[in-house]
Regions:
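Transmembrane helix interruption/hinge and helix-loop junction motifs
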Residues: 63-72, 114-116
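Structural signature of hydrophobic alpha-helical transmembrane segments
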Residues: 10-20, 67-74
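Interhelical loop and helix-boundary elements at the membrane-water interface
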Residues: 8, 18-59, 77, 81-112, ...
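Alpha-helical phosphate/pyrophosphate-handling elements in metalloenzyme active cores
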Residues: 2, 55-65
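Transit-peptide-like, low-complexity N-terminal presequences
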Residues: 1-8
Length: 116
């Protein structure tokens, strides 16, 4: 089953939507508790794996909805989780974290462009 939206025929529009969606999901929808407790050793109310999986899954859902390609949503979930785990483990700066996430969005746009 192929899902399509009006904006996916224009790669720049899709990239803009993915970046806007990223900001929505990564900041206001994440919440302070999840931002802290998704890191190993900082979990208090729930095991960090659940927090990280839930956060990555919201990103995956957003990518699947905006691209119309569920497999890209799964890829986003996995890669986003790995990037955030790396940030927790190695403590790299927010700008590095965000640059990695935005790079993924560019890759997803390239994939959609090739697929269409």
């Amino acid at each position: 089953m192929q899902y399509t939206f009006a904006h996916v025929d224009q790669p720049l529009n899709l990239l803009i939507m993915l970046v806007l969606g990223h900001f929505l999901v990564d900041f206001p929808l994440q919440g302070d508790k999840m931002a802290v407790e998704k890191c190993p050793g900082k979990d208090v109310t729930l095991n960090w794996r659940w927090w990280l999986t839930a956060h990555a899954a919201t990103h995956g859902f957003m990518v699947a909805v905006l691209t119309g390609v569920p497999f890209l949503g799964l890829a986003e979930m996995l890669v986003h989780g790995l990037i955030d785990f790396g940030k927790c483990r190695f403590g790299y700066k927010l700008i590095v974290d965000q640059a990695l996430h935005w790079s993924c969005k560019m890759i997803w746009v390239a994939c959609v462009t090739v697929m269409h």
